[in-house]
């Protein structure tokens, strides 16, 4: 390895006795002895405060850490890093990790917390990453999904919404999406049965596959509509009963849906 200075960052909130990660978690084999890592703190996937109880391999001491999660909503987060309060205008635990990485770099270059806070205050959701717009009178949020961990975190984020909403899941299988869509079976779509979602649209090239995945969760099959054409998904959203809608979309489906929104003059085609 290069002899460069290293900044370790992560979460250092409430700990438990070491326990195994979720059975479907990848990347939990110890790189030293090939034992199974356990976690005193497991934020999601294989991230957190890990240790191998066979050989002692463990997470290095953190340089920059989230030491308190003050508030987590579907549209924003409040948290403390190294004792300083921060706020970001975007939802989801995964975005706190993004903010934490930025703070770690800023910390290394001696950027003050006040400057970091001003930067966070100016940040906003962009280009399919919790991008908001209206379809008719519906408040809509577009969220990119592209792998099991990211999809599960997006589902965790929308689960925080304090209101009912319609849901659209758009699945394409172009090269930019990944032509193997079996990853949808590793994403925790089962959580949708715990949300107030009166109706779901399954759309995109692989609409039948995502519709099947959603039916397997136990969500009522008669409340799932399939549409290969995104124009039909758009029309469906416009006519749905809830004032809020979430659209989870793989990469090329997100691009196609944004193109449709731009043609309807609901968003700018290119975001600054």
Region spans (language model):
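Residue-level detector of alpha-helix boundaries and kinks
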Residues: 15-18, 40, 87, 139, ...
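ATP-dependent carboxylate-amine ligase
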Residues: 25-27, 31-34, 44-57, 104-113, ...
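Extended acidic/charged loop-beta regions that coordinate divalent cations
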Residues: 1-85
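A short local loop/turn or secondary-structure capping micro-motif enriched for an aromatic residue
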Residues: 16, 95-97, 149-150
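Long, charge-rich boundary regions
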Residues: 56-134
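Short glycine-rich loop/turn motifs that provide flexible caps or phosphate-binding loops at active sites
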Residues: 9, 91, 202-203
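Short, structured coil/loop segments at alpha-helix boundaries
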Residues: 22, 39, 89-94, 250
